[in-house]
From Swiss-Prot:
Cofactor binding, per record: Binds 1 [4Fe-4S] cluster per subunit. The cluster is coordinated with 3 cysteines and an exchangeable S-adenosyl-L-methionine.
Keyword Iron-sulfur applies: yes
Pfam family, one: ThiC_Rad_SAM
Annotated positions binding [4Fe-4S] cluster: 560, 563, 568
Upper classification of the organism: Bacteria, Pseudomonadati, Bacteroidota, Bacteroidia, Bacteroidales
Binding site for Zn(2+): 416, 480
Signal peptide: none
Name of the protein in its database record: Phosphomethylpyrimidine synthase
Any one GO cellular component localisation term in the record: cytosol
Length: 587
């Protein structure tokens, strides 16, 4: 195996900081502080600007004091918290037959992560989930961690400014999020805190309508492209630019080993679609899929530390004929596999039939379930059709079953939906699925943007994020065309960070407005470096500016290359403001 190389170090103008807990003083919650320069007043005096603290998903990779060693993995920050709860036990060995086979295969030695845990954790009494704790009225360290993280020290801001209230459209956005608020949202099923007890490296985060909108980045090899090294680098690269979670959708060689490397080096929750690996185990023959192999795959991945599973349990046998009226049929990979199986065997899927047993497995490890939308529309023509809505209603029924077993649950959504149908989609989901968090792929608002689908989907993502979606699954410019590379991942993540931020602004999140306010102030005052550093992609902002004005002195100039020195509106504003102020003083 080649030597791993990942991108490390802070973003321009930023530094990693840690905030301690109050209830749990041992907590060290990571954030990114963007350093602001002084404002130069008309009289030449300097006025200090407050630094801006923002949410940070990058883990230890941007901490200059941390020595990166991918063969060792990132720190297991939750290990002691899990141990102290006393409700889990170390198993004598791997429970999955496939996991044991891979572990004993000497030919995989060079590919295998060196420090594989062969004694994973499981709940002593069958359940060790954050939902269970929340329902018992318990505030866990993970819950306080999340509360501190969501607030981004906004209560310490001293600058007086008029904050925009936003229009939350039914969401409840507190000025300050408390650990108790986090607990209550999880207990109500309106939010999840994905945190497998076998992924102690993960930094707690929350997905819910009443919190900051999150984004997911998909990575994964295919049978014809990519290596373990490339996928680990993609994961680290995605979180550097703001991915809150990462889904490993590998379908190629060494899925088990690739996933182990990713999890051990990931400070964010990792999701998978277990059905993909199950299909690989039967050499791609859908007819040979069965409950026993799928069950073993769930246990295998849960004991590795996967934090949430996409499971297409809501696609019923009688739903399949509804897709015959569609223009593009079933476009979900998981959905097409299940539909094929149901049609071949002329019965309900083994996933639907064994759903309660699935929940029992997930509760043992605190794996959240993302109920997959196997019948999501694959084109504008099919949006909000009978097949999509029928499955969504089934997902609502399954949500209640999952909650019965204290399994944290989110609902997956479309897809391709024109703008005028997006709000309706959100409203149907909220009612059918009892307020469980919605997790959508876009949606794409048009079908004609090949090569630009990150843009057409971000338009829909910003809207549905405002309407109530809790997490947005990114779409890259390679969507419908090919497997995304490293730069496609960056472009997709930053584009979706923008969509999520726009939704947060519309909903009235105070932290979102504060960052925009400080950007506008820096722009009006021609503090170019501060503008770069406050951007979602500082490196690209610097690159674009320097392409036409490369000299260091131009970063102090009161104009840019768009308008030039004599046509800059902000420069003109400053001039006539000065005149008006002088006139006011003279009067």
């Amino acid at each position: 195996m080649k030597e791993f190389k990942v991108t490390t170090g802070p973003l321009p103008g930023s530094e990693k900081i840690y905030v301690e807990g109050e209830r749990f003083p041992f907590l060290r919650v990571p954030m990114r502080r963007i350093r602001m320069s002084d404002t130069i007043l008309e009289n030449g005096e300097r006025e200090k600007n407050e630094d801006v603290v923002v949410y940070d998903t990058s883990g230890p990779y941007t901490d200059t004091s941390y020595e990166v060693n991918l063969h060792r993995g990132v720190p297991k920050i939750r290990e002691q918290w899990i141990e102290d709860r006393g409700d889990t036990v170390r198993l004598e060995g791997l429970s999955s037959e496939y996991g044991r086979i891979r572990q004993s295969d000497a030919s995989l030695e060079k590919l295998r992560y060196e420090h594989v845990c062969t004694r994973p954790r499981a709940a002593k009494d069958g359940c060790a989930t954050q939902l269970y704790y929340a329902r018992q009225g318990i505030v866990t360290p993970e819950m306080e961690f999340v509360a501190i993280r969501e607030n981004q020290l906004i209560d310490q801001v001293r600058t007086r400014y008029r904050a925009e209230e936003g229009e939350p459209l039914g969401a409840v956005i507190p000025r300050k999020i408390t650990p108790e608020f986090v607990r209550d949202e999880i207990a109500a099923g309106r939010a999840i805190l994905p945190a497998n007890i076998n992924h102690p490296e993960s930094e707690p985060m929350i997905i819910g309508r009443n919190f900051l909108v999150k984004i997911n980045a998909n990575i994964g090899n295919s049978p014809i492209s990519s290596t373990i090294e490339e996928e680990v680098e993609k994961a680290v690269w995605a979180i550097r630019w703001g991915a809150d979670t990462v889904m490993d959708l590998s379908t190629g060689d060494h899925i088990h080993e690739t996933r182990e490397w990713i999890i051990r080096n990931s400070p964010v929750p990792i999701g998978t679609v277990p059905l993909y690996q199950t299909l690989e185990k039967v050499q791609g023959d859908v007819t040979k899929l069965n409950w026993e192999i799928f069950r073993d795959t769930l246990i295998e991945q849960a004991e590795q530390g996967v934090d949430y599973f996409t499971i297409h349990a809501g696609l019923r046998w009688h739903h399949v004929p509804l897709t015959l009226r569609r223009l593009t049929g079933i476009v979900s990979r998981g959905g097409s596999i299940i539909a094929n199986w149901c049609t071949t065997h002329k019965r309900e899927s083994f996933i639907y039939e064994h759903f309660e047993e699935i929940c029992q497995i997930l509760a043992r490890y605190d794996v959240a379930i993302s109920l997959g939308d196997g019948l999501r529309p694959g084109c504008i023509h099919d949006a909000n059709d009978a097949a999509q809505i029928a499955e969504l209603k089934t997902l609502g029924e399954l949500t209640e079953i999952a909650w019965k077993y204290n399994v944290q649950t989110i609902i997956e959504g479309p897809g391709h939906v024109p703008m005028h149908k997006i709000r309706e989609n959100m409203e149907i989901q909220l009612e059918a699925c009892h307020g469980a968090p919605f997790y959508t792929l876009g949606p794409l608002v048009s079908d004609v943007a090949s090569g630009y689908d990150h843009i057409t989907s971000a338009i829909g993502a910003a809207q549905i994020g405002w309407f109530g979606t809790a997490m947005l699954c990114y779409v890259t410019q390679k969507e419908h065309l090919g497997l995304p590379n490293r730069e496609d991942v960056r472009e997709g993540v930053v584009t979706y960070r923008l969509a999520a931020h726009a939704a947060d602004l519309a909903k009235g999140h105070p932290t979102a407005y504060w960052r925009d306010y400080m950007m506008s102030k820096a722009r009006f005052e021609f503090r170019w470096k501060d503008q770069f550093h406050l951007s979602l992609d500082p490196e690209k902002a610097i690159q674009f500016h320097d392409a036409t004005l490369p000299d260091e002195g131009h970063k102090e100039a009161h104009f840019c290359s768009m308008c030039g020195e004599h046509f800059c509106s902000m420069r003109a504003n400053k001039n006539f403001r000065k005149l008006l102020n002088e006139e006011a003083v003279s009067k």
